[in-house]
């Protein structure tokens, strides 16, 4: 029988509610709307898929507060899944990156299935404190101290890449043997300045030195900040 097309396979999302989580922050149960911080179309700026055209869907809310983060956590626009679908439809790229904030606070298995049925490849950028929903094509985990003891529980099958932001020796990662399996283990020197767009020479030197001593790691520069794109 001939396929009726992707739209016919889009599952209906169930309604949900906002409630308090027992761990770290507010979480959202499956719902027909999401709080969106911003949507933009650009190149993936770092990591294994650097340089690929991607639709960035930045979700509001986070359960951590990191000094180097470039996101305003709490503001955003409430959008239905259908409005979100229509907002990204004009972009020719078919790669979605769910980022934040901490996207696992809002992203559900139902939402992932919805966009998968529309033919999108979906990645997530997470801090590792919560298990991502099933169905994602790629997981980037940038673990924070609060998540280190949770990584094996939250990622029993491993991740696509671990990416550790590094600004000082205290930020250097544990041994690879202590982490779940990953396709790549990356060190990302932080950027500084008022707009966090200036390379930190000391952080770069620290990363390079660590990688030379531990060659299972590799360097991941934030290319989008170097060439000044979103």
Identify what each model region corresponds to.
Residues 1-6, 17-18, 26, 48, ...:
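Intrinsically disordered, low-complexity regions
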Residues 3, 10-56, 60, 65-68, ...:
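Flexible, acidic/Gly-rich N-terminal and inter-domain linker regions that tether
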Residues 5-10, 29, 89-91, 131-132, ...:
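Intrinsic-disorder/low-complexity coil detector
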Residues 9, 23-29, 76, 108, ...:
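A ubiquitous, low-specificity "background" feature that marks scattered single residues
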Residues 34, 40, 49, 56-58, ...:
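Broad hydrophobic/π-residue packing in well-ordered secondary structure
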Residues 37-41, 53-56, 63-136:
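Conserved Radical SAM active-site core
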Residues 104-230:
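Conserved AdoMet/S-adenosylmethionine-binding subsite of the radical SAM
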